[in-house]
From Swiss-Prot:
Gene (name only): atpF1
InterPro entries for this protein: ATP_synth_B-like_membr_sf, ATP_synth_b/b'su_bac/chlpt, ATP_synth_F0_bsu_bac
Keywords for the protein's UniProt record, in alphabetical order: ATP synthesis, CF(0), Hydrogen ion transport, Ion transport, Membrane, Thylakoid, Transmembrane, Transmembrane helix, Transport
Function statement: F(1)F(0) ATP synthase produces ATP from ADP in the presence of a proton or sodium gradient. F-type ATPases consist of two structural domains, F(1) containing the extramembraneous catalytic core and F(0) containing the membrane proton channel, linked together by a central stalk and a peripheral stalk. During catalysis, ATP synthesis in the catalytic domain of F(1) is coupled via a rotary mechanism of the central stalk subunits to proton translocation.
Keyword Transmembrane: yes
Lineage: Bacteria, Bacillati, Cyanobacteriota, Cyanophyceae, Oscillatoriophycideae
Main subcellular localisation: membrane
Residues passing through the membrane, by range: 26-48
Topology of the protein relative to the lipid bilayer: Single-pass membrane protein
Subunit structure: F-type ATPases have 2 components, F(1) - the catalytic core - and F(0) - the membrane proton channel. F(1) has five subunits: alpha(3), beta(3), gamma(1), delta(1), epsilon(1). F(0) has four main subunits: a(1), b(1), b'(1) and c(10-14). The alpha and beta chains form an alternating ring which encloses part of the gamma chain. F(1) is attached to F(0) by a central stalk formed by the gamma and epsilon chains, while a peripheral stalk is formed by the delta, b and b' chains.
Highest taxon of the lineage: Bacteria
GO MF, one annotated term: proton-transporting ATP synthase activity, rotational mechanism
One Pfam family here: ATP-synt_B
Name this polypeptide is given: ATP synthase subunit b 1
Length: 175
């Protein structure tokens, strides 16, 4: 009935307040709001507390993950620095080893060259000695051939007999 009177007064062109407590259901509304406040506040409080706990747990979890990520990043950076230092050391060791190997190879090469030179000089000396010996033999043969030819032309049989007898006497075979 309150709505009808409201519409009736609104149709008459005025606005007025209805102060009849029973007609406006203020008591019913107060009871419902009170019940909702008493029981709803506990329910909503529990929901809000649960939500708050979940948010706090999520924040703590996020902070823990961020802390772990930071620790992992720090460890990875340290590992990277160590790896870079080790790589630099390996590079330096490789340079030293390469230089040592180079010097060893050069030394071996010089030794081989010296051996080859010595071998060549020795072979040359040997060949030179062979050639000199061959020349001496050839000169001796030519000289003997010339002496024989001259002896045949200059010596007759009596001179040859005297020469043979004298040679035998010199050798100690003469009586």
């Amino acid at each position: 009935m309150g709505i009808i009177s409201y519409l009736a007064t609104a149709s008459e062109g005025g606005f007025h307040l209805n102060f009849d407590i029973l007609e406006t259901n203020i008591i019913n509304l107060a009871i419902i709001i009170g019940v909702l406040y008493v029981y709803g506040s506990k329910f909503i409080g529990n929901i809000l507390e649960t939500r708050k706990s979940k948010i706090v747990a999520d924040l703590e979890d996020a902070e823990n993950r961020a802390k772990k990520a930071q620790e992992a990043l720090t460890k990875a950076q340290k590992d990277l620095e160590q790896a870079q230092a080790q790589a630099a050391k390996i590079r330096e060791d490789a340079k030293v080893a390469a230089e040592k190997t180079k010097q060893d190879i050069l030394a071996k090469g010089r030794d081989e060259v010296e051996k080859l030179k010595a071998s060549a000089v020795k072979e040359l000396s040997t060949e030179q000695a062979k050639v000199i010996t061959e020349l001496k033999r050839r000169v001796a043969e030519l000289a003997l051939a010339k002496v024989e030819a001259q002896l045949r032309s200059d010596l007759d049989e009596s001179a040859q007999a005297k020469l043979v007898d004298r040679s035998i006497a010199q050798l100690g075979g003469g009586a």
